[in-house]
Structures are given as C-alpha cells and as structure tokens.
C-alpha cells in the first residue's frame, strides 16, 4: 500500500477504499499500473464504490483487492453492477451515506449535498460524478468524492486527474487520504474529521 497511511487491526480501525467513475471501457482503457501496484489485497477492509465501474470485469478486479464491496449504480453501469441509488452503512462510529451522482443535481452544489446528508441522517456522505477528488467538512458533515480513478474525461474537463480516497476510520475520527496521479507519480493529501459526541 502507498506509504503514509497507517493500517491497524480490526475492530480498532478500518481502512476503506473509496473509488468510482472508472468508466472502463467507454471513457478510459484501464486503471493505471501505478494505482494497481499500490492497491494490494489484504490491506483494505472495505470498498465503497460511487458507481460507473461500467463492466463486470472491473468489479471482479475490485473484488481481488477486497471482497467486501458496497456500490451504488452509476448511469453507465451494466445491470449486473448494482441496482441501488443510495445506501447507508455504519463504519466505526460513523453513519456513512453512499449515493449515486445522477441522483444529485447539481453535483457540486454544497447545499444540495447537505439536503441529501440530512435526508439520510449521516455523518459522512460519499458521492461521485465530478471526476475531481475532494474531502471537506460542511455544516458538521464530512463530504467525500473520490474523483475518477482512471481520469475519465467529462464534458467540462477533458483531462481530470486520476484519483481515489483511502479512508482510515478509528472510532469517531476519520482521516481521508486523497491519492492523485500526475506526471507518473502519486501525491497524497489528507483531511481529518472528528464526530462530536
């Protein structure tokens, strides 16, 4: 696994891969070799996928990293990927909402995301669709967008930066490590969120 992320044994903490918008084979040919080399089996406890994996072979690849996958349906996904638009789960001391980007409009509107967060009554809201990774706190909630793992193009950005998030959850503290791939090398930024008790 890429350096800079602490791993620990369950149930003290969990390492969650947040990934989405691969768009393979429609908008991208594959996940980069560098990302594949760093996403090794046995390190990650769970995967949250924001959709647009597109085909079964890519979902099968994600299962080689971790068999515990929760995914929502993206608008380009084959029927076998998921038929769920949103779901809520508990990770550590957090209620986490995972939502399809096409159920949110506009997808970068913080007030629209906050409405969805309140509707689901979650501490962390995970969404995709922007193809730009972000992790920020807004109105007492942690919002995570893993961006596009392949850097798949959009109508507004022909060259997004490939990215994903590793979320380290320890009780009521979550640290999001945002991995981006630029010019053949990985950089990591982090954002921390603690739930008020």
Located regions from the model:
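Helix-adjacent hinge/juxtasegments
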Residues: 68-122
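Conserved beta-sheet core of the metallophosphoesterase superfamily
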Residues: 70, 107-173
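Single conserved hydrophobic/aromatic residue that forms the stacking wall/gate
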Residues: 1-12
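Charged phosphate-binding loop/patch that engages nucleotide di/tri-phosphates or the phosphate backbone
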Residues: 170-197
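Active-site environment of divalent metal-dependent phosphoester hydrolases
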Residues: 24-27, 53-58, 76-82, 104-108, ...
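Beta-strand-turn-beta hairpins that frame and shape the catalytic cleft
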Residues: 13-17, 88-97, 138-143, 169-175
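N-terminal active-site segment of His-dependent metallophosphoesterases
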Residues: 11-68, 77-85, 93, 163, ...
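Active-site neighborhood of phospho(di)ester-bond hydrolases with catalytic His/Asp-centered motifs
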Residues: 18-20, 46-52, 70-74, 98-100, ...
């Amino acid at each position: 696994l890429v350096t800079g992320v602490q791993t620990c044994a369950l149930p003290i903490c969990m390492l969650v891969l947040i990934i989405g918008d691969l768009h393979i084979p429609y908008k991208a040919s594959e996940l980069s070799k560098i990302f594949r080399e760093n996403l090794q089996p046995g390190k990650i406890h769970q995967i949250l996928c924001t959709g647009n994996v597109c085909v079964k072979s890519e979902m099968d690849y994600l299962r080689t990293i971790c068999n515990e996958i929760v995914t929502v349906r993206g608008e380009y996904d084959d029927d076998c990927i998921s038929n769920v638009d949103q779901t809520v789960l508990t990770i550590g001391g957090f209620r986490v909402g995972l939502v399809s980007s096409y159920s949110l409009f506009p997808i970068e509107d913080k007030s629209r995301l906050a409405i969805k967060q309140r509707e689901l009554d979650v501490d962390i809201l995970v969404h995709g669709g922007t193809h730009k990774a972000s992790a920020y706190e807004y109105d007492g909630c942690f919002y995570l967008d893993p961006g596009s793992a392949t850097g798949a193009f959009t109508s507004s950005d022909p060259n997004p930066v490939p990215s994903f998030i590793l979320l380290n959850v320890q009780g009521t503290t979550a640290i999001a490590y945002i991995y981006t791939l630029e010019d053949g090398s990985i950089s990591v930024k982090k954002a921390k969120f603690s739930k008020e008790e």
